[in-house]
């Protein structure tokens, strides 16, 4: 809300408006003077969006009569929490149940901590006062690709250095390959399969050295370096030792009910196992609340979608093709390209495809992976279909409005069912 999902999407949208005005308005018959970037206003709007959302949450807390204490919370014992405010004042809270939901923070390189000036995390990258001339991004995952895209659109030279041989490695391999193609068209430079060996701040220049698998080295110089190699649970100040909880690789161990080893203490979100996603944390929060109310809730972790808010967007749910191969499961693939989609042509957003994985015997949809315009919204169709164990044929036989991006899902399901998409 403050330094993650919402501010990054605000900047992604603003930067997309900017590049469209600069490069695509003329094709739509809109003649305007050359647009000029006002980064100060862009950052200001982002902050206003964040404030609006924060104020909305504060209103909901008040409406539901939830008391809020601002400060650093830590355990005194399993039924006592101490909150230390910024002015050093301490407040003691007595409680029957505790839910730990403290989130995560960016992980630095072991040999180069964040200086928050030139070697920055996503937090500082959302608050830059100047447009980088050359932004070097370490890490080709979701955060690196999203923020790298923002500054590439605004005119920065952007270079991505990734240790693995593919982008967004946790998603289906086809998505990473397609994202590489489209972001190269944006002008982003990539060094895949490179391990960063040194990173130094030399005043107004950062110098990075990286080594490929064949031991050849490269040296890159930029004015900012965004380190986006992952995040780690934020548990440092909780005083977990006071209640006998030990972390494992930084995470708080929980059982299938999200309960810790201490019977009245639960943990959710980024501090526990699983993907570090806001909507996963939300599902877990609802799960624990309903459980404490005596209900019998359920979270299907396989069907928690993942999204990359580049443009085109990338969205995924269910199994990847790589996972199905590893399981030895027989499957079939249905794919449909955006360039064959009337709605995509009308919007001039023809990069991308929909990929559906279905069981070879039963036709049940096992995974859906989309790269293209509106993918973040479209993936809900995959979640719904898989939640009710629909087959590819089930979706293919449903009427989809024309012209829409969702028709690509229908066509991909037709391709998976009997290799008979209508428009390719």
Q: Across the structure, where does each feature detected by a protein language model lie?
A:
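Short hydrophobic core segments
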Residues: 73, 93-103, 137-138, 158, ...
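Glycine-rich Rossmann-fold phosphate-binding loop(s) that bind the pyrophosphate
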Residues: 138-141, 270
